[in-house]
Amino acid sequence: TIALFTALSCSALSCVNAKMDTYAKHVDTRIGTGGHGHVFVGANVPFGMVQLGPTSVPQEWDWTSGYHASDSTVIGFSHTHLSGTGIGDLFDITVMPVVGKSVYERGKVGQPETGLWSYADRSKEISIPGYYSVPLTRYGILAELTATDRVGLHRYTFPKSEEAAIVLDLENGGCWDKAEDTHIEVVDGNSIRGWRHSKGWA
């Protein structure tokens, strides 16, 4: 009886997982990213605390989610985004992988030398439920993101270089979001801690 129950349980779970996988394939995560949709693109789970995805250089109304279909600039990957609101906020803790010397500023569109931002190769962008990846053309880096209920996970594949680095940007957010107090410290060889207090719409 126990063996039969186990077999039936496994079969039932397999059916549920198969259905979930099938439904996820139909999700278009880019709906609402053009026009005035203000929709965030990136990695998250339903009702999760993290919305991990790219944040762009422009701070105009159509970019309040940090992403717009017409633009491929990336200043980094922020852990929190508002989606569909039409007003920007959050963008807390932006992470940007870099190679070589960079100006540690947001920069201006069309002028990469003014900041650390990169163009993203949107032709190779992957955005599916729970996973996001895109190549950063300036640095030759592949960025991959995923998320759990409370944590954003990053994986960066760098080219061979002695000048590879990861920038933790506590200053630059997005539209309406302004950092008021920030702090970061190195705890040990594997840990950092800090905070970012910002003022925005919400």
Regions found by a protein language model. Give the residues of each.
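Accessory carbohydrate-recognition regions in carbohydrate-active enzymes
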Residues: 18-202
